[in-house]
């Protein structure tokens, strides 16, 4: 009986994601990431800003960098650049001929990003578009990107997702950040515009026959969706 209980407990634990304590997060950052010096300096600089919570962590940056490499992406679209951690991480993983289009509404934040791009030697690969991303999306050619990353204002997430479905080629990837929103998406007692918008998009993608997808419990939750061929 004890063996049965032990086996059941082990099976249950195997199907669950670990609770990430601060100590475990630190362990992952120490041994699971090789953070580029420019990224480390940028992370430290951004932590001094009141909005530092908008920055992705080094583990997510490393994952996205590796994803660029294994997917062979050469054209990347980023919606929501902030101070440039994610764009720098992905641009460093691009081949020499690779290019990125980054969309943001803030010159103040993206001035920090520009310095990081220059320090990392990737500024020639990045085309920064200042203005509403919905308008920028309308100017981009269909099927012209291999990968898109959405990490901007949550009320516009659905519009960004639909726009990315148009501009990302079949077989390409769409990444959506903050899809778990500190766990609040799973708490029925929490009702606000941001959480409701994220829940609605999560449910939409789960039922969307245009993509294959998975929600990864990395950072604040990351959806990875592959655009199915028509």
Model region roles, listed by residue range:
Residues 33-37, 52, 210:
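Alpha-helical structural elements of signaling/regulatory helical domains
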Residues 2-39:
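N-terminal auxiliary segments of SAM/dcSAM-dependent transferases
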Residues 42:
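Beta-strand-loop-alpha "switch" segments that mediate conformational coupling across diverse proteins
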Residues 54, 58-230:
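S-adenosylmethionine/decaboxylated-SAM
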Residues 26-31, 48-54:
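A glycine-/small-polar-enriched, mobile loop at the entrance of the PLP active site in fold-type I
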């Amino acid at each position: 009986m004890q063996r049965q209980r032990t086996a059941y407990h082990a099976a249950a634990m195997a199907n669950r994601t670990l609770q990430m304590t601060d100590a475990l997060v630190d362990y992952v950052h120490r041994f699971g990431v090789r953070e580029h010096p420019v990224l480390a300096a940028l992370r430290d600089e951004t932590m001094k800003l009141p909005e530092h919570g908008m920055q992705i962590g080094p583990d997510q940056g490393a994952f996205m960098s590796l994803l660029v490499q294994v997917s062979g992406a050469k054209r990347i679209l980023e919606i929501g650049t902030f101070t440039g951690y994610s764009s720098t991480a992905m641009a460093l993983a691009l081949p020499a001929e690779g290019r990125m289009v980054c969309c943001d509404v803030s010159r103040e934040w993206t001035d920090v990003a520009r310095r990081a791009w220059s320090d990392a030697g990737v500024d020639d690969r990045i085309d920064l578009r200042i203005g509403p991303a919905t308008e920028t999306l309308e100017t981009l050619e269909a099927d012209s990107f291999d990968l898109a990353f959405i990490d901007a204002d949550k009320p516009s997430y659905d519009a960004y997702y639909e726009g990315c479905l148009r501009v990302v080629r079949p077989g390409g990837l769409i990444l959506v950040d903050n899809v778990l929103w500190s766990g609040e998406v799973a708490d029925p007692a929490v009702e606000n515009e941001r959480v409701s918008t994220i829940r609605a998009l999560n449910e939409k993608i789960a039922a969307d026959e245009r993509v294959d997808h998975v929600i990864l419990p990395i950072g604040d939750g990351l959806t990875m969706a592959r655009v199915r061929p028509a």
